[in-house]
């Protein structure tokens, strides 16, 4: 019966440069969910404009007091929110805080974990304390004085300049000498008030998804990222300038180490739902593979061609069942 189904909001959009990317993830999720089991609605959130987007192009305003809306003269209340906001306010803990206040279960980690993973500098330093390999980095705040030569000496060249709190590679630059730092910082500060300057790690970039429920742990096959661009930037990520190989071409030993690291980081963070962890596999001084954590995406892209759906298919799983696992784990 229709009334026995859980009613789920796919919360997408957001306030960042990734708004349109998030909408695409929302549409992907809408196509993936088991509609025999759930009533699914797309909720577009941008600033103070929160509305349900219906298939026929019509919309209905969300009542922010209880996250409900009116359809055909009747109030519709949600049982669960699947958050696929990339960037603010869904990847930095703000949306999670709102849902906590109104006691609505949701798909992601909680406020603290979201805020910490959204800030790359904070995350790096936190995980380093648990023995996770990360690149050296420096944090600069808007208006803070800096010395290009000192940074070059401390971090080395080349390096990456990136917004400390952002995603989808907006505002990220690869810097090859000290003279390129100032323009790269200007670009990064357009996206965030804090910028991280991070040492370059030479190696193979991979990305791995994971989710855990009360019953099971599912570590998905890793994806290897091969791009002709300088790095895996926005153009490579969303305009097809990349080759994605799933499963990644890793030795069995390295693949096992990556999977163990992924599972351990998930537990360290007390993460929830499905997350994706990016790594660089470099070589240590003895020529052995070294697993370096690059960043964590707690609301990974969910279009048909995104990493997570690719990895789910490679694992021989059905994305519909994966999403049901994540939802039902909250009940």
Language-model features: locations:
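Phosphate-binding site of ATP-dependent enzymes
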Residues: 176-260, 283-292
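ATP-binding N-terminal substructure of ATP-dependent carboxylate-amine bond-forming enzymes
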Residues: 1-107, 111-112, 116-118, 122, ...
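Hydrophobic beta-strand scaffold residues
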Residues: 40, 105-106, 134, 159, ...
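Active-site nucleotide/adenylate-binding loops and adjacent lid/helix of ATP-dependent enzymes
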Residues: 2-12, 16, 24, 116-204
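Short Gly/Pro-enriched turn/cap motifs at secondary-structure boundaries
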Residues: 88, 163-164, 199-200, 266-271
